């Protein structure tokens, strides 16, 4: 929840979600 993964999730889910990133405020974050 604090480290940006450099990916947005406005239209599609976080591809980086495979690495543990989650969508928050249309941006993918790690932890």
UniProtKB/Swiss-Prot annotation:
InterPro entries linked: Cyclotide, Cyclotide_bracelet_CS, Cyclotide_sf
Recorded coiled-coil stretches: none
Keywords recorded for this protein, A-Z: Disulfide bond, Plant defense
Position(s), cross-link Cyclopeptide (Gly-Asn): 1-31
GO annotation (BP), single: defense response
Post-translational modification comment from the UniProt entry: This is a cyclic peptide.
UniProt-listed PROSITE patterns: CYCLOTIDE, CYCLOTIDE_BRACELET
Disulfide bonds: 5-21, 9-23, 14-28
UniProt note: domains: The presence of a 'disulfide through disulfide knot' structurally defines this protein as a knottin.
Recorded family membership: Belongs to the cyclotide family. Bracelet subfamily.
Entry function: Probably participates in a plant defense mechanism.
Protein name (record): Cyclotide pali-A
Species the sequence originates in: Palicourea guianensis (Showy cappel)
């Amino acid at each position: 929840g604090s480290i940006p993964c450099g990916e947005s999730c406005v239209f599609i889910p976080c591809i980086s979600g495979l690495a543990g990133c989650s969508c928050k405020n249309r941006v993918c974050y790690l932890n």
